[in-house]
From Swiss-Prot:
GO biological process: protein maturation
Gene name, Swiss-Prot/TrEMBL: fdhE
Pfam family, one: FdhE_C
Protein name: Protein FdhE homolog
Role: Necessary for formate dehydrogenase activity.
Domain of life: Bacteria
Recorded GO MF terms: ferric iron binding
Gene Ontology CC: cytosol
Keywords attached to this entry: Cytoplasm
Cellular compartments annotated: Cytoplasm
Family: Belongs to the FdhE family.
Protein's UniProt keywords contain Amino-acid biosynthesis: no
C-alpha cells in the first residue's frame, strides 16, 4: 500500500473519494514543532547518560525554530505536484527535485545562530562548514540523500541535515494538493519526499490508535497499519521489545523476515513523546536490538552513521 498525492485540479475529476476515514498523510505543522522538540530534548536530557548530546541537539532544534521565522519560504508547488503525480513520484523527491540556494541560506543562518552556543570541536565543525564552498555543500547534501555516509563526516551531517530538513519541511507545509491511499509499493519511504522515517507513533486524539511513520527529512507523517513491518510489509514474524514493562511508551518492532526494526512511540502511554527526541534519547534500546541481531531501518537526523558503520 503506497500513498499518492493528488493535485487540487484533479480532485474533482477523480472518480474516487479522497476524504478517507483514515487520513493517509499528515503534513507538517511547523508552528512550535522545533520549539516542542527542543523542549522535549532538554527534558529527556535530565538523568540520561546521553544528556550532553541531547542538549546539543536541543540547541540545533531551537535554532531551526528561529531560522524558520527569519527565512520564510514562498513557493508555488502546483506544477511540481502535477508533474510528480503524472510520473508516480513523490512531489519533493530528494533524488529528483533540484535544490535552490534557499537551503544554503538556511544553513548559514543556523550556523550564525549556533556559533555563540558552541565551543570546542562542535564550534570547529560549524566554522569549517561556514567556510565551505557552495559546491562542497551541494556535494555533501547529495551524498546524504544517496546514503553515502562515508562521504560526510558524522559531526557535519547533523548541521547539513538540519538545513535540508528545514527547507524540505517548509516546502511540504506548502503543498496545496491532498493525499489518497492507493495500492502500490514502497510504503517504507515518505510519499512526499522519498526519505525514510525516524520512528513511528501511535496517536491519540482525532487519529486515536493509528500508527504514522514520521519522516526524518520533511516532517510529514504517513499512515501504516499496525502489526505490519514498516520496512518489508510482512506480518508473520513481528516482535515488540522494550527496556521497561509491556506498558512502555517506547518499543521496538522487529521483523524476522527482513531483520530490521523500527521504534514505535505510544502517545497513550506518554502524550509528550516526540518522534525525533524520544528516538534519540532511547539509544540503549537500539543497542539491545543490535545485540539481538536486528538492523535499524531508520535514521535519526541528529545521529548519522560514520564511515565504516
Amino acid at each position: 500500500m503506497s500513498i499518492r498525492i493528488i493535485p487540487q485540479d484533479q480532485l474533482e475529476k477523480s472518480d474516487k473519494r479522497t476524504a478517507e476515514v483514515i487520513p493517509p498523510l499528515l503534513f507538517p505543522r511547523l508552528k512550535n514543532l522545533y520549539n516542542r522538540r527542543a523542549a522535549r530534548l532538554r527534558e529527556l536530557a535530565e538523568n540520561n547518560p546521553l544528556g550532553d548530546y541531547l542538549r546539543f541537539a536541543a540547541l540545533i532544534a531551537h535554532a531551526q525554530e528561529v531560522v524558520l521565522y527569519d527565512h520564510p519560504l514562498e513557493m508555488d508547488l502546483t506544477a511540481r505536484i502535477k508533474a510528480a503525480a503524472e510520473q508516480g513520484k513523490p512531489p519533493l523527491d530528494i533524488h529528483v527535485l533540484p535544490r535552490d540556494g534557499h537551503w544554503q541560506k538556511l544553513l548559514q543562518s543556523l550556523i550564525a545562530e549556533l556559533k555563540p552556543e558552541m565551543s570546542g570541536p562542535a564550534l570547529a565543525v560549524i566554522e569549517n562548514l561556514e567556510k565551505a564552498s557552495a559546491q562542497e555543500l551541494e556535494t555533501m547534501a547529495s551524498a546524504l540523500f544517496s546514503a553515502d555516509f562515508s562521504a560526510v563526516s558524522s559531526d557535519k551531517a547533523p548541521f547539513i541535515w538540519a538545513a535540508l530538513s528545514l527547507y524540505w519541511a517548509q516546502m511540504a507545509s506548502l503543498i496545496p494538493g491532498k493525499a489518497r491511499a492507493e495500492y502500490g509499493e514502497a510504503r517504507q519511504f515518505c510519499p512526499v519526499c522519498g526519505s525514510i522515517p525516524v520512528s513511528s507513533m501511535v496517536h491519540i486524539g482525532s487519529s486515536q490508535g493509528l500508527r504514522y511513520l514520521h519522516c526524518n527529512l520533511c516532517e510529514t507523517e504517513w499512515h501504516v497499519v499496525r502489526v505490519k513491518c514498516s520496512n518489508c510489509e510482512q506480518t508473520r514474524d513481528l516482535h515488540y521489545w522494550s527496556l521497561e514493562s509491556e506498558q512502555a511508551a517506547i518499543k521496538a518492532e522487529s521483523c524476522g523476515d527482513c531483520g530490521t526494526y523500527l521504534k514505535i512511540l505510544y502517545q497513550e502511554k506518554d502524550p509528550n513523546v516526540e518522534p525525533v527526541a524520544d528516538d534519540l534519547a532511547s539509544l540503549v534500546l537500539d543497542a539491545r536490538m543490535e545485540q539481538e541481531g536486528f538492523a535499524r531501518s531508520s535514521i535519526n537526523p541528529f545521529l548519522f552513521p560514520g564511515e565504516g558503520e
